[in-house]
Amino acid sequence: MKKNIIIALLAVLIGGFVQSQEVKWQSIENASKTENTTKLYFIDFYTNWCGWCKRMDRETFSDSTVATILNKYYIPIKFNAEGASQFEWNSHTFTKGISVNGRPATHTFVTYVLGNKIGYPSFAIFNPEKRLLQVIPGYVKADEFAQILWY
């Protein structure tokens, strides 16, 4: 009997560790309407063609520690840098950029946040008042990313 209880407890504990946490991504349109929050905003700037963006999804954002931190302390936002959404952020209206030479247009919000240092993936952290605090460029491994998110 005692052995069965120990086995059952181990199964529950191991199952809890194996179960992965997923980031609860929001759209920029929904997040931009958020008011009276104490959480920071975290924005993942990506494109559909970006291999390193897909690797971040697969390896970094799927990490349970990273996902837990993002869900608990941030409003996590996925933003397609070549998308066509229109929204207001911190009293500014942003729209799809203008396509040049048939290339996909970079959204005006990307230019506003990243300036002339546009690259993917890139990440931005804003305070609850939607003012930019930090930009993080490029691929980052899960353990390093968790440390960045704590600070």
Model-inferred region functions:
Residues M1-E22:
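Bacterial Sec-dependent N-terminal signal peptides
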Residues E22-W25, D63-R103:
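Thiol-based oxidoreductase modules, predominantly thioredoxin-like and allied folds used
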Residues K24-Y41:
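A short beta-strand-turn-helix
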Residues N36-G51, P76:
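Short active-site neighborhood of thiol/selenol oxidoreductases, capturing the structured segment around
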Residues L40, T95-A124:
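Structural micro-motif
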Residues K54-R58:
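Detector for the c-type heme attachment site
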Residues P76, F109, G119-V135:
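A short, hydrophobic beta-strand/beta-hairpin element that forms part of a small beta-sheet core
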Residues N127-Y151:
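Thiol-/selenol-based redox modules, centered on thioredoxin-like
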